[in-house]
């Protein structure tokens, strides 16, 4: 890991955010999924990164194995059901999301359409994993 990433992680830690570094999408997936405990209730906000890294796929596999329960706000075409799932996701044990940007000073930049990611980041879930 180069000095720039070490510095960013140090700045995240100063903000009470545990930072991790991964060289590959596979490493990022392994780190992220390791933060989920058996029996956890898991949800997420809209994030292409979760799909590109295979995190959501792995979480669905964990659910099929009976290890976790998922609240999927995007698993329905019904807008009312989707909104209800987003609200319920705020009470999850682990909430996955991605930020729009991360500054070198360890600041997360978030712009959100419905507000569920930003709401989850600031209040609600027991643990938030930003990928």
Predicted regions and their residues:
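The feature marks the mature, well-folded catalytic cores of soluble enzymes
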Residues: 1-131
């Amino acid at each position: 890991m180069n000095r720039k990433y070490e510095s960013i992680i140090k700045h995240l830690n100063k903000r009470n955010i545990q930072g991790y570094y991964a060289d590959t999408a596979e490493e990022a997936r392994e780190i992220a999924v390791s933060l989920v405990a058996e029996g956890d209730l898991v949800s997420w906000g809209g994030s292409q990164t979760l799909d590109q890294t295979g995190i959501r796929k792995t979480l669905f596999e964990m659910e099929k194995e009976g290890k976790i329960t998922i609240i999927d706000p995007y698993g329905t075409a019904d807008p009312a059901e989707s909104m209800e799932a987003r609200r319920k996701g705020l009470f999850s044990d682990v909430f996955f999301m991605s930020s729009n940007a991360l500054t070198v000073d360890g600041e997360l930049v978030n712009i959100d359409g419905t507000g569920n990611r930003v709401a989850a980041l600031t209040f609600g879930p027991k643990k938030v994993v930003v990928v």
